[in-house]
């Protein structure tokens, strides 16, 4: 497909965009100590610009020392201007354009713990401070011009300070900045005027806004949203960047939508607003394919399309779409583990990506080796395949030894759960990528100490993965007791009343899978059902369990199993009251976790032979796939 609409030019004031694709502002956490731009941030943006992105919008910047959340870059000193100028110069040299997102967090940065993990109670803003903040937005816009940016964006969504003023659910002021719709909009109108008056007439002005204000006690109506955007357009806003979500309700999930939400879930909501406003629209929301991106432009539903996490997963997404090589795209799977979870986890230095562990490491490049080595990779899961791909690309000779009859076994199983087809597709994609690169694979091959000696590799990477952790429960060998793997592999399909023991990440998905097939499921967990799930995944669990009518038994220890019965002790979380009981069921599925597959013998043999060896992924200890693939990437780069 040529995707003519997607790759048609677009002009906003004096800015000529070569196509309709924008990299929206997304937090990377790469700002150094809140004040410096390093080679990693520059390389990240340059890579997307070289691939053909029409406009990169730099992540939100703090406009004053407080609040200045620990992961954001600042824009309130000459030093910030100098640092950001390095970035814009590099992107311009690469043929791209740069915008910047002007931001004030209000109470929302308190969600993101600082380095000391402390929280503070936010204060009510004085009118004097409101006027200062308006001036700070104006100063930030002026500094953005000095730093060489081609466009500015005002972030007025997602429960940040501007949205807190706009929403009747958050704005409880009784002065000129609260109460009536006009008063609630006053702060934003003043900010828009301050920004417009501090940038050149030919400089485009974007504004991020919510196309729906929802799931709070009081929200902006559709009419209010339309009126607000049209008034901002009169005051100088050129493009409405329409998103969805807030930080005070379940609507948080719409900001960084996980796999539970359909691709393009927000298209019609955005189009509904577009039809009622007087300026062009940029839209976002799990738009991951060239076909979908082209369609929203072709049908007039968007004027510009934000391709965000798809460009995190593959910096060359645009090149591959333009050249008709979409089968080579590393697709985002909506796991949110490397992007969203990393942002809210202060222990993570920067974002990463399950499918693209080289994210934020673009500055390293992929240096070719001048001493090719024969590398034995024991295990063909995601970590092993990523390691092999990196090694092959760098000029080494990796060989994958896989005990089963196919690659990506565990990740394929992850794709069996409801709404996770993308995961299964990625498992298949990785297997095909190994084949495309010409990497030798030996399936149905169990590696022993003797195998290593016979193969005589220069290096060994052990990526044998994990195995089922079977708890010591009397009666666990009863005929009606099955493992998570038996269910996910399709070896069994328990029906009727089914107890699922161990409801962390895998257990909740097994519970939903069986319930979707008609089983009456009871989810049993020693701690709390859903323990270990990411924040957004936990938010989806309750409505999904309600939809599937899955019963939950948290704080429950299983003491024994027998045919058709589960014996348990339950501790009430609030009262600490302990009760014993017997649950009658037709089948029981054990999902109590995984443990590293034994590999000490292989490692010891390598050491005896003097062969450099590294253990990665689940083989080094149970971990999520994002960490495993990053370890595979690092192992491939280290040789």
From Swiss-Prot:
Residues at which [4Fe-4S] cluster binds: 332, 335, 339, 353
Signal peptide extent: none
Membrane-spanning parts: none
CDD domains from the UniProt entry: OYE_like_FMN_family
Family annotation (Pfam families): Oxidored_FMN, Pyr_redox_2
Binding site for FAD: 337, 383, 402, 410, 420, 447
Keyword check for Transmembrane: no
Active site location: 160
Residues annotated as binding substrate: 155-158
GO cellular component term of the entry, any: cytoplasm
GO molecular function, one term: oxidoreductase activity, acting on the aldehyde or oxo group of donors, NAD or NADP as acceptor
Catalytic activity: 7alpha,12alpha-dihydroxy-3-oxochol-24-oyl-CoA + NAD(+) = 7alpha,12alpha-dihydroxy-3-oxochol-4-en-24-oyl-CoA + NADH + H(+); 7alpha-hydroxy-3-oxochol-24-oyl-CoA + NAD(+) = 7alpha-hydroxy-3-oxochol-4-en-24-oyl-CoA + NADH + H(+)
Cofactor(s) of this protein: FMN; FAD; [4Fe-4S] cluster
BP terms from Gene Ontology: bile acid catabolic process; lipid catabolic process
Biochemical pathway: Lipid metabolism; bile acid degradation
EC number(s) recorded for this UniProt protein: 1.3.1.115
Gene3D superfamilies referenced in this protein's UniProt entry, alphabetically: Aldolase class I, FAD/NAD(P)-binding domain, NAD(P)-binding Rossmann-like Domain
Family: In the N-terminal section; belongs to the NADH:flavin oxidoreductase/NADH oxidase family.
Name this protein carries in UniProt: 3-oxocholoyl-CoA 4-desaturase
Lineage: Bacteria, Bacillati, Bacillota, Clostridia, Lachnospirales
